UniProtKB/Swiss-Prot annotation:
Provenance organism: Treponema pallidum (strain Nichols)
GO BP annotation list: translation
Keywords per UniProt: Ribonucleoprotein, Ribosomal protein
InterPro entries (UniProt xref): Ribosomal_bL17 (IPR000456), Ribosomal_bL17_CS (IPR047859), Ribosomal_bL17_sf (IPR036373)
Record flagged with keyword Kinase: no
HAMAP family with a match to the protein in the record: Ribosomal_bL17
Region (Disordered): 127-164
Protein name as annotated: Large ribosomal subunit protein bL17
Originating gene: rplQ
Gene Ontology terms for molecular function: structural constituent of ribosome
A GO CC term assigned to this protein in UniProt: cytosolic large ribosomal subunit
Length: 164
């Protein structure tokens, strides 16, 4: 019996899994909140917690270790200048997973992965968008000839009957 042969948590190759984790962690630190599936969020959470722990003490060694994982210099700077100091008093549990429900297309469990001190009001100020859908061009105007049964030159005739 072959024990422990079933390791493939995201059903993808190792290089793709590594790139996926790296990109999602970078997005998490950049936007401080991402929406994804539950298994991906669990993988990203594990990596993000380790990187935040390293970013709490700003040293050359820690910067280089984190830079192996996060290639975006702006996100790396944000991690060490903003996120790390904010989490300095916390001993772990820097992220939270909020369940959103099932995705309609494939019934996958969708969750929100966010940093613990993330505030929703802060993001609302950044994205001031309206919830209304813009109307189509010309919506609401009806063709007068179709409604009243008039011909465009002004003569009226009955709709549906031919003149013989």
């Amino acid at each position: 019996m072959r024990h422990r042969t079933g390791f493939n948590p995201l059903s993808c190759m190792a290089a793709h899994r590594r790139a996926l984790r790296r990109n999602m962690v970078t997005s998490l630190f950049k936007f401080e909140r991402i929406t994804t599936t539950k298994p991906k969020a669990a993988e990203v959470r594990r990596a993000a917690e380790r990187l935040i722990t390293r970013s709490k003490s700003d040293s050359v060694h820690n910067r280089r270790q984190v830079a192996r994982f996060i290639w975006d210099k702006a996100v790396l700077h944000k991690l060490f200048a903003d996120i790390g100091p904010r989490m300095r008093e916390r001993e772990g549990g820097y992220t939270r997973i909020l369940k959103l429900g099932l995705r309609q297309g494939d019934a996958a469990h969708v969750v929100v992965l966010e940093l613990v001190d993330y505030t929703f009001e802060k993001s609302l100020k950044k994205r001031a968008r309206t919830d209304s859908v813009p109307a189509r061009k010309g919506a609401g105007k009806k063709d007068a000839s179709r409604v009243s049964g008039t011909v465009p030159d002004g003569q009226s005739q009955k709709i549906g009957k031919k003149k013989e």
